């Protein structure tokens, strides 16, 4: 997701709460070794109206990596050569381009990446085959509806837009939202892949904040990210972060147990 404020891309183990290392067998029956981490998932920017496909893969050092969709069509083929090929790669993350719904409708997007079992195959430096199977779901969590100190999220953060409605508040600042319980309700948006909406299980929430500051005459973007368990629906912004200025942008992201994630963006100004 190319956020309007260049969101921190959080692919850390903390964000995903990964426990695959302890849940996968050491060696499969056919001597193929599974990747220690293997995830393919969707990310929806509900504010901008765009979808992208992401993957996070980690394991033994490899020189070749391929991904096949449920129809056995190859969607990724990476071969490492030269000195890097001799060194090998381990952790690998990608995110696709994310055209707006005007350019690529969500219906076409989900047809392009069907739900089902995706095979991730690789070749280790010593020639050993690596393989994992992952499930990709079209179930997207409904967008969070955040409040800043009890005030509904601003819908338009561009000062030049006639609908500019930035939230004006004072410290301390608490961002809260109701628990996300269902999948996306919009059949022409993030819910295009699954209708009617179904119940979801939230894996975690994430709040990202950003402010542009001037440091010795140069503009600098300060960011912070906070990850909460599924029962956490409230964050008090650290006073040290708020002390940097007055105009802040923020994002609240809901990550489902299938790792699909839906984010909304907004803003607030301190009095």
What residues fall within each predicted segment?
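Conserved aromatic anchor
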Residues: 55, 166-199
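Bacterial N-terminal signal peptides
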Residues: 11-22
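Extracellular fibronectin type III
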Residues: 130-133, 255-271
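Surface-exposed, short loops/turns at beta-strand junctions within beta-sandwich domains
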Residues: 108-115, 239-246
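Long, polar/Ser/Thr-enriched low-complexity segments
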Residues: 28-107, 115, 119
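Recognizes extended acidic, P/S/T-rich segments that occur
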Residues: 72-104, 188-243
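Proline/serine/threonine-rich low-complexity linkers at boundaries of modular beta-sandwich domains
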Residues: 132-153
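Beta-strand-rich modules
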Residues: 124, 240-262
